[in-house]
C-alpha cells in the first residue's frame, strides 16, 4: 500500500512502494545518481559507475543481490 506525504507546498502526494523501500533500506542518494545518469544518457551502459555505487551500498546493508544466473537456476528447479 502506498503512503501519502505532504509536498513542500502542502499538497498531498502518494509515495510508491519502491520509494518507500529505498528510504527504509538506505541508498537513496546512490539511486538518485543512477537515475540521473540514465535520464541524461538514456543508456544504462554509460552508468556503470553509478550502478556499482548503488550495488555496493545495497549489498552493504542487505547482502548480495541475486545474479541473473541465480534467478534462472531457481526458475529451473
From Swiss-Prot:
<dbReference type="GO" id="GO:0005758">
    <property type="term" value="C:mitochondrial intermembrane space"/>
</dbReference>
<dbReference type="InterPro" id="IPR010625">
    <property type="entry name" value="CHCH"/>
</dbReference>
<protein>
    <recommendedName>
        <fullName>Coiled-coil-helix-coiled-coil-helix domain-containing protein C550.01c</fullName>
    </recommendedName>
</protein>
<feature type="short sequence motif" description="Cx9C motif 1">
    <location>
        <begin position="27"/>
        <end position="37"/>
    </location>
</feature>
<feature type="domain" description="CHCH">
    <location>
        <begin position="24"/>
        <end position="65"/>
    </location>
</feature>
<keyword id="KW-0539">Nucleus</keyword>
<feature type="disulfide bond">
    <location>
        <begin position="27"/>
        <end position="57"/>
    </location>
</feature>
<keyword id="KW-1015">Disulfide bond</keyword>
<dbReference type="GO" id="GO:0005634">
    <property type="term" value="C:nucleus"/>
</dbReference>
<dbReference type="GO" id="GO:0033617">
    <property type="term" value="P:mitochondrial cytochrome c oxidase assembly"/>
</dbReference>
<keyword id="KW-0963">Cytoplasm</keyword>
<feature type="short sequence motif" description="Cx9C motif 2">
    <location>
        <begin position="47"/>
        <end position="57"/>
    </location>
</feature>
<feature type="disulfide bond">
    <location>
        <begin position="37"/>
        <end position="47"/>
    </location>
</feature>
<dbReference type="InterPro" id="IPR039870">
    <property type="entry name" value="Coa4-like"/>
</dbReference>
<dbReference type="Pfam" id="PF06747">
    <property type="entry name" value="CHCH"/>
</dbReference>
